[in-house]
Design a protein with these regions (language model features):
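Subtilisin-like serine protease catalytic core
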Residues: 11-13, 51, 62-65, 173-175, ...
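Hydrolase catalytic cores
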Residues: 55, 64-66, 72-73, 211-277
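Substrate-binding/access-modulating region of protease and related hydrolase catalytic domains
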Residues: 1-33, 49-79, 83-173, 219-233
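Conserved, compact domain cores that house catalytic/ligand-binding motifs in diverse enzymes
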Residues: 158-221, 225
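Short, intrinsically disordered, charge-balanced linker/junction segments flanking boundaries
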Residues: 278-284
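Non-catalytic, beta-strand-enriched accessory regions in extracellular/secretory proteins
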Residues: 35-47
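Conserved small/polar residues in nucleotide/adenosyl-binding loops
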Residues: 285-291
Length: 295
C-alpha cells in the first residue's frame, strides 16, 4: 500500500495527509536489538477467554535467530527452523501454526507468523514466552506485533510493550504527511499517538497537530469532543490547502504541492515540550503555518 500511495502522491498537484494511528499506548507491540550469542525473552500475557491469537515477528532477513516458544505451564518447543509451508506444534491445549516468510521485491525484512489455535474454545491463558537467540546477527533489530483494532480481550498484550515503531499504515508511506497528535493545552505529545522509529528508512511522523479533546461537528448537527490522530490530520490537510491556494490558485508558486508543502510545514513547525532531540520518534515538531518561509 505504501508504494501505491507514494506513486499516487507523485501524480499531479497533490498532497496526501494521514494520521499515525492511536496505538502508541497499547500493549500490542514489542521489539529490541538482539546481539549475537545472546538470548532475548519476550513475555506475552494471554487473557482469559481469548478465542484466537496471532503474533507477527519481523526481522532483517540476513539475521539468523533461533526461536523458542514456551507455554504458561513451561512446555517449550524449539529451536524452530526456516522451511517452506506451515509448521505445526502443540503446547498444552493450543496448536501453534508457524509460517516463515521471505523477503519481497520491495522489502528486505522477513515475517515469521505464529498462529495460536485452541483445541477447545480458548487459547491457554497465562504468560507465554518468545525466546530469540542470536546465531548470526548483523543488525539484530526485531519487532513483534499483535492484532490491533481492539480485537483482543482485556489482559492480552506484551508485558514490556514499546511505543516506538507504532505507526499504522499508511502513515509509513514516504511521500505522505504523517501527523501525530499532541495536547495543545499542555504542549505535550499524546501518549496514544503512533510513534516512529530510528530503524525506519525515513523519519516519521512529519508533524504533530492538536488531537486531544478537539471540538468537532458530528452527524445530525451539533458538536462533540473527540480525541485521536484522525482529528489531528485535518489541521494539517487544511494548512496544506491554504498553502496550495496561496501558491497555485493565486499564482504565487505554481509548484507548491507534494514534498514542497511538506518541507514548508516542517520548517514552520515549533517544538513540542519534553524532548531534547529533534526530529525524534514523535515528530519533527507541532504544526504552525510557515508564513515567513513563503516570502
Amino acid at each position: 500500500m505504501e508504494n501505491y500511495i507514494d506513486t499516487v502522491a507523485a501524480m499531479g498537484r497533490t498532497v496526501i495527509v494521514t494520521g499515525t494511528g492511536n496505538n502508541g499506548s497499547q500493549p500490542w507491540h514489542a521489539g529490541g536489538i538482539l546481539q549475537q550469542g545472546k538470548t532475548e525473552e519476550i513475555q506475552l500475557a494471554v487473557g482469559a477467554f481469548e478465542p484466537t491469537l496471532n503474533v507477527q515477528l519481523w526481522k532483517d532477513y540476513e539475521d539468523e535467530m533461533e526461536i523458542y516458544l514456551e507455554s504458561p505451564s513451561g512446555e517449550r518447543i524449539g529451536p524452530l527452523y526456516e522451511r517452506l509451508g506451515p509448521q505445526r506444534h502443540l503446547l498444552e491445549n493450543t496448536e501453534l501454526l508457524i509460517y516463515y516468510g521471505k523477503p519481497g521485491p520491495y522489502q528486505l525484512s522477513q515475517e515469521i507468523y505464529i498462529d495460536f489455535i485452541p483445541e477447545g474454545n480458548y487459547v491457554d491463558s497465562g504468560v507465554w514466552k518468545v525466546l530469540l537467540s542470536g546465531k548470526r546477527v548483523r543488525s539484530g533489530q526485531y519487532f513483534l506485533w499483535l492484532p490491533g483494532g481492539n480485537v483482543l480481550n482485556r489482559g492480552t498484550g506484551f508485558y514490556s510493550p514499546r511505543a516506538v515503531g507504532t505507526l499504522t499504515i499508511p502513515s509509513t508511506a514516504g511521500k505522505v504527511i504523517s501527523v501525530g497528535a499532541y495536547d495543545s493545552r499542555q504542549n505535550a505529545y499524546a501518549d496514544f499517538s503512533g510513534r516512529g522509529s530510528q530503524f525506519l528508512p525515513i523519519r516519521k511522523p512529519d508533524l504533530a497537530a492538536p488531537g486531544v479533546s478537539i471540538s468537532a461537528p458530528v452527524p445530525g448537527g451539533g458538536y462533540a469532543t473527540v480525541t485521536g490522530t484522525s482529528f489531528a490530520a485535518p489541521f494539517v490537510s487544511g494548512s496544506a490547502a491554504l498553502l496550495m491556494e496561496w501558491g497555485i490558485v493565486k499564482g504565487n508558486d505554481p509548484f507548491l504541492y507534494g514534498e514542497k508543502v511538506k518541507a514548508y510545514l516542517r520548517k514552520g513547525a515549533q517544538r513540542v515540550g519534553g524532548y531534547e532531540e529533534y526530529p525524534n520518534a514523535v515528530s519533527y515538531t507541532h504544526l504552525t503555518l510557515p508564513t515567513n518561509s513563503l516570502v
